[in-house]
């Protein structure tokens, strides 16, 4: 990619900042925010993909893993294995919200959530966390996705594997080279095995 398309090493949140963000949603007992942030951070879903998620996308692969069967993009279908911790959280959320079909995430008007809704949701947390110096800067949904992809690569996945999983064109994977080479980020390389804690989430909370 062009030089200006290569991400600087400080473009993404480090592991401590990610933990602070998830902890803030966790402490607020905000099921929706916690799950949305987790889907970006752990699975690298785009904002658009999260907003378009339907109950019907959830399935099991031939080995019994819980998956999202994503709609074809450029004639390519993707089956994304859902990590166990997110799968548990997703099951609890769907059950608590009584989602039988259609959109998994709704806005306050009970319509499918829009990309601007998720950005506002994230901003409501980043504003507080920046003020309390628990985040260095305001991050966007795209920034969190960059973090997810970077840590997948740091965790040992090949560029081709990550590109296929996240739906990114392979030639753009080089944009993460500077981040991967960063000593600061590599100190947090154990991010890829961080498990999302579920015990404190209130399953009865409805928004």
Which ranges hold each PLM region?
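Alpha-helix N-cap/helix-start motif at helix boundaries, enriched for small hydrophobics
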Residues: 36-37, 44-53, 162
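Basic, Lys/Arg- and aromatic-enriched nucleic-acid-binding interface segment
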Residues: 17-45
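Short, basic (Lys/Arg/His-rich) helix/loop patches that form interaction surfaces
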Residues: 123-164, 168
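Active-site/catalytic core of tyrosine-dependent DNA strand-transfer enzymes
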Residues: 83-135
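A short, basic/aromatic helix-end/turn motif that makes direct DNA contacts
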Residues: 52-58, 163-170, 178-185, 190-191
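Conserved tyrosine-mediated DNA breakage-rejoining catalytic core shared by Y-recombinases
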Residues: 52-86
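Flexible interdomain linker/hinge and immediately adjacent N-terminus
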Residues: 1-20
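DNA/chromatin major-groove-contacting recognition/catalytic segments
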Residues: 175-207
């Amino acid at each position: 990619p062009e030089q200006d398309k290569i991400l600087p090493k400080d473009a993404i949140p480090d592991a401590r900042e990610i933990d602070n963000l998830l902890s803030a949603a966790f402490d607020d007992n905000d099921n929706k925010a916690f799950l949305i942030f987790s889907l970006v951070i752990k699975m690298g879903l785009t904002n658009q993909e999260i907003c378009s998620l339907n109950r019907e996308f959830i399935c099991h692969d031939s080995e019994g893993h819980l998956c999202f069967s994503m709609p074809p993009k450029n004639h390519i279908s993707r089956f994304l294995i859902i990590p166990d911790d997110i799968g548990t959280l997703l099951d609890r959320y769907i059950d608590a919200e009584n989602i039988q079909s259609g959109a998994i995430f709704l806005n306050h008007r009970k319509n499918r959530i829009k990309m601007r809704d998720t950005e506002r949701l994230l901003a409501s947390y980043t504003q507080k966390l920046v003020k309390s110096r628990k985040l260095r800067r305001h991050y966007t949904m795209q920034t969190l996705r960059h973090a997810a992809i970077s840590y997948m690569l740091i965790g040992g996945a090949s560029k081709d594997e990550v590109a296929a999983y996240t739906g990114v064109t392979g030639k753009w994977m080089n944009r993460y080279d500077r981040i991967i080479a960063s000593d600061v980020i590599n100190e947090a390389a154990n991010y890829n095995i961080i498990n999302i804690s579920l015990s404190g989430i209130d399953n009865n909370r409805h928004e």
